[in-house]
Design a protein with these regions (language model features):
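Short acidic-glycine motifs
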Residues: 1-223
Length: 223
């Protein structure tokens, strides 16, 4: 297995005035992961993650007793997963008659298990593109014996997803027909095979939150 990870961070702070400051941070991350999922060499998954994260905070002193804080965050996570099979060969290249359960082209996928011998597994192609937005505002007010806070939080979540899980078949050979799993493999007599249709999903969600809080200091011993 192999992992390459690259990260970069930029941070900035700026004061517009004695009562207004802003700070921001940008994070860029790229991760390439070669995952060996079975126990035969040459079969693995190439997984690529790319992440952008942006955060900004604006703090405004409205008066000696009142402060407003606004926070914005944005997070973008892209995941691309590709299967790697020696020679880019599927079972159909060896004379089988399986039909892929998706349209278009994709790298060859292999998930073949021979009980007691090996598990040739390369994972399956997929893409996950996620975006998350968050807007938060908090107003803090110190008024005599009361410390008041009012806030709102708005979140937006976006996901674009495509998965070709078992578009090429999962095939398992046991000792069902000949009493020997390897012999069943040579004769092309599987114990089990499974295929699943292509999955598309594009959910979009909103989340809204509000809060109000009063810390009341009744006396020195009671709040």
């Amino acid at each position: 297995q192999k992992v390459d990870d690259y990260q970069g961070v930029v941070k900035i702070d700026h004061r517009f005035s004695n009562s207004n400051t802003i700070s921001g941070r940008l994070l860029r991350n790229k991760n390439d992961y070669q995952e060996a999922t079975g126990n035969l060499p040459g079969f693995f998954a190439l997984i690529n993650y790319q992440n952008w994260n942006i955060a900004a905070t604006d703090t405004h002193i409205i008066s000696p007793s009142m402060i407003n804080s606004f926070v914005f965050t944005y997070n973008k996570i892209d995941r691309r997963q590709i299967s790697v099979v020696p020679g880019d060969k599927t079972w159909n290249d060896f004379g089988a008659g399986f039909t892929r359960t998706f349209e278009g082209s994709a790298p060859a996928v292999m998930h073949t298990q021979v009980d007691g011998y090996f598990n040739a597994f390369s994972r399956f192609p997929l893409i996950h593109f996620r975006q998350n937005f968050q807007f938060s505002n908090t107003l803090s007010w110190n008024k005599g014996a009361h410390f008041l806070e009012l806030g709102v939080d708005v979140r937006r979540q976006i996901l674009d997803m495509q998965e070709l899980f078992r578009g090429d078949p999962y095939i398992r050979f046991g000792n069902t027909w000949t009493g020997e799993a390897a012999a069943d493999l040579m004769l092309g007599l599987p114990l089990q095979f499974e295929q699943i249709a292509e999955a598309h999903n594009f959910p979009r969600t909103w989340a809204l939150g509000f809060f109000a809080q009063d810390d009341w200091k009744v006396n020195r011993q009671l709040t």
